[in-house]
Amino acid sequence: MTTKKQEKIKFSKAFWVANTVELFERAAYYGVFIVITLYLSRILGFNDIQAASIAGIFSACLYLLPTFAGALADKIGFRNSMLLAFTLLTCGYLGLAVYPTWLQSAGLVEYSTTTTFTGLLESNLQYGIIPIMALIVCGGAFIKSVISGTVAKETTPETRAKGFSIFYAMVNIGAFSGKTIVKPLREALGNEGLITLNYFSASMTFLALLAIWFFYKSAQHSGEGKTFGQIWNALIKVCSNGRLITLIIIITGFWMVQHQLYATMPKYVLRLAGEGASPSWYANVNPLVVVLTVNLVTQMMRKRTALTP
């Protein structure tokens, strides 16, 4: 009995490496995403509607593309996919830091605790941030499919629930950590901290890249999977399932509300409570509760299925 129990909680090296880099990636992503609309408005001069629209499209693409990125990842292998993903993410986050610096050196804007626009708003150069954000979307699309795929393939039916609870805990530890550094940077540097934050995110994804390069090896998922045509046909089949589409619409409603933590809440809190307020800490309630309760909930639901009332 004891031996059997020990086998159930034993995971492969690839499992732990994948979960560790997931923590790094989530810290990078949420550190930036909690202030993305502030960044777009205060650093690049977009108004509220423009900033929210760009952030919304960014998020929508990030959640749509994993379906297709996952198919490509199956073809080229998970290790190669993660190397590509973290390279794109590192370049993307670095671009979010470097691009405003270039705009400032061109005399179009001045950054300090506040921002003074000296020509940027009259140019179209603020839209140069779009292809940089596209790098993050493409890199993130691979990560969303590959890390969860690694967890699935590196676990057994007996250890899968525990494996995914560890994965989900890592996601939320990363989210909590990334958002925690936002307030100190804003207090110390003001608007300039919104730029500096991206160097932190780039360093996190670069560390993840190194971890994959040196430590990630697995024979579980090299070159296999479906073609894009098969994926597309499967999507059409899914869309014809009325019950599933109804469930997706219900879940979409939840995510529409949840994502207001990032789309509108930071600006709302700062305008209502002042610049000393901490929208990042308000948003941290979610990952903190998840980290503290995920193991308990996993144990409670162990003998139930997704359809068990």
Model regions and ranges:
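Juxtamembrane intracellular "pre-TM" segments in multi-pass secondary transporters
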Residues: 2-12, 221-249
